[in-house]
Amino acid sequence: QAYKELIPSDGPVRTQVVGEVTREKEQQAQRVKEFMNYMLMEVMEEYTPDFDQLLFYLPLAGSAFKKIYYDEVLERAVSKFVAAEDLIVPYYTTHLSECERITHVIKMSENEIFKKQKAGFYRDIDLQQTDEEDEVQDKYNEIEGVSRTDRGDNYQYSILEMHVHLDLDEYTTDQDDKKIKIPYIVTIDEGSQKILSIYRNYRPDDPQFRRKEYFVHFKFLPGLGFYG
């Protein structure tokens, strides 16, 4: 029932004219609504299945996330489901918007990483596999009745995408700016501990250096901790 309410057949986007309502504004709002629903329901192929997966996962784990970002390889916006165990925040965190370090653990095949390296988004480094077992994923596999196969060419590398605040001298021109850490996204290959990329995570014309938010938090029930 939740899926039908959140994603109706004509799309989830609704628009509202704020302020004086005119015919031109209403027509513009309708165009925005139609375009956004077209993007979500037709172009972004992962949107509906990932949202369905999130709704199924939410009561099992109590917490789940959506990650909305621009994919350099696909050259379009992407909205993906992120499991609670794959998004790590400091112990004291109460809300994502106030958290200064968010780590997204991403599983990527070698080919996916090569694509990003070829596109110039990742550095060309030697990747290294890890021997660590994912106990949480193993438990999910047990519930689903599936098991791991030999790694072979299907090995998934652990990529750590960290949304952090840093003081990088080479990226600051004003001496006063060095006193304040500003938002960056640092991506690391967990196996080799080498940096794949560092990108700023704020708009160039923003004097406040406000972080661009990538994640949306869904809680099944409120709780005492961050994850509900």
List the predicted regions and their residue ranges.
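Extended alpha-helical, oligomerization-prone segments that build pores/tubes and scaffolds
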Residues: 1-228
